[in-house]
Amino acid sequence: MTEPDTERKGSSRRGFLAGLGAAALTGAGIGMAAGEVLRPLLPDSDPAASPEAEQRLRMAAQRADATAAPQPGISGPAPAFVHVIALDLAEEARKNPDTARDSAAAALRSWTELAARLHEESPHDIAEGAASAGLLPASLMVTVGIGGSLLSAIDAEDRRPDALADLPEFSTDDLHPRWCGGDFMLQVGAEDPMVLTAAVEELVAAAADATAVRWSLRGFRRTAAAARDPDATPRNLMGQIDGTANPAQDHPLFDRTITARPADNPAHAWMDGGSYLVVRRIRMLLTEWRKLDVAARERVIGRRLDTGAPLGSRNETDPVVLSARDEEGEPLIPENAHVRLASPENNLGARMFRRGYSYDQGWRDDGVRDAGLLFMAWQGDPATGFIPVQRSLADQGDALNRYIRHEGSALFAVPAAREGRYLGQDLIEG
């Protein structure tokens, strides 16, 4: 490449950043602006041949849908990075139900207002010197949840929906209290880790007088920029395609799966139209998993490792045929395969929408790798979603249990956003 060409490309990039920054401030037309000006920078610059490339660019350049129901961060394309933070009311605030209620209202009001600003602006527009300065919106999204323990603190147990009952103990649990529970939950996602970090810092600081962090975990998945097909189901750290069985977001089953039904009890109506999030910290025993050959791994899961297809099938999205047998009459999908025991057919139709991430904390002091799955499952009621599926996996001998450890667990109610009201206001002030 000649020197004049290099200069022109550098100039073009600077011009693009300036122009796209202006488009980001206006909000409108950002997707078009990103696609048009970034095409010359792509390895394959033929726009007709690379619609996937344009989609990659949009994830970095666009803003999240602030009107997504019940809150942003549940539907739509999943960003590459997420930070889940569980918080408790400060000790001083828990002295009595009145102070707890006032502090909860202050925290939820602050997060609602700040989340709205973050969806419209950027962290560096809100706080001078933020780490995200100079970066695009990166699909930043914020979700706010409420734990059952908060209702106890504000003396509102009578307003606790059955769906927010404590999760039962499962026979395979190896839970650590420091990674469980929480009065509140913040899920913050973005396509760029610096944008994510800057937003998390502002959100935690906004309620620092009323709350304290209980636990947090950062997760990641493949970026849109690196994906050959941004719509493809991502893989986890075990190399599995993970999330194939999710209901399609454009299918009526999706809303039926994630949305809380209208309550029979008016005291529980604050969660009408909301959703329930189960979070599990699942450490993978990757050293043991690596000892298995590909065929053994596929028998554990019940799917092909390369394509994600159910054993005996050809395509990832082919239905799981539990009755299929080989020439010798043996089940093509083993009786203890993960996909068999987790299937709706094996669990009275139980379904959830999984939107999980990988996590990697490096190596512990004892030399053990601390990496695995930040499991997140959305449903209208855990009793017809996560609970029966997890009970089946735990009690019926899921072959995957040998290679994973459930070390953290929490359940949060995620109320629907309502015009002119802060998140959870119907609970706190209702």
From Swiss-Prot:
Catalytic reactions on record: Reactive Blue 5 + 2 H2O2 = 2,2'-disulfonyl azobenzene + 3-[(4-amino-6-chloro-1,3,5-triazin-2-yl)amino]benzenesulfonate + phthalate + 2 H2O + 2 H(+)
Annotated EC: 1.11.1.19
Entry binding sites for heme: 338
Subcellular localization(s) per the UniProt record: Secreted
Sections of the chain in a coiled coil: none
pH dependence: Optimum pH is 3.5 with Reactive Blue 19 as substrate.
Cofactor: heme b
Start-end of Low complexity biased regions: 60-69
SUPFAM superfamilies to which the protein is assigned, alphabetical: Dimeric alpha+beta barrel (SSF54909)
Catalytic residues, chain numbering: 242 (proton acceptor)
Cellular component GO terms held in the UniProt record: cytosol; extracellular region
Post-translational modification as stated in the protein's UniProt record: Exported by the Tat system. The position of the signal peptide cleavage has not been experimentally proven.
Chief place where the protein resides: secreted
Details of cofactor binding: Binds 1 heme b (iron(II)-protoporphyrin IX) group non-covalently.
Region annotation Disordered: where it falls in the sequence: 42-75
Pfam families per the UniProt record, alphabetical: Dyp_perox_C, Dyp_perox_N
Outcome when changing residue 338 to A: Lacks the heme cofactor. 3% of wild-type catalytic activity
Keyword terms of this UniProt record: Heme, Iron, Metal-binding, Oxidoreductase, Peroxidase, Secreted, Signal
Leading EC class: oxidoreductase
A molecular function GO annotation: metal ion binding
Subunit text: Monomer.
Protein purpose: Peroxidase that is able to convert a large number of compounds, but its physiological substrate is not known. Shows high reactivity towards anthraquinone dyes (e.g. Reactive Blue 19) and a modest activity towards standard peroxidase substrates (such as guaiacol and 2,6-dimethoxyphenol) and azo dyes (e.g. Reactive Blue 5). Is also able to oxidize aromatic sulfides enantioselectively, resulting in the corresponding (R)-sulfoxides, but with a poor efficiency. Does not display catalase activity.
Protein name in the entry: Dye-decolorizing peroxidase Tfu_3078
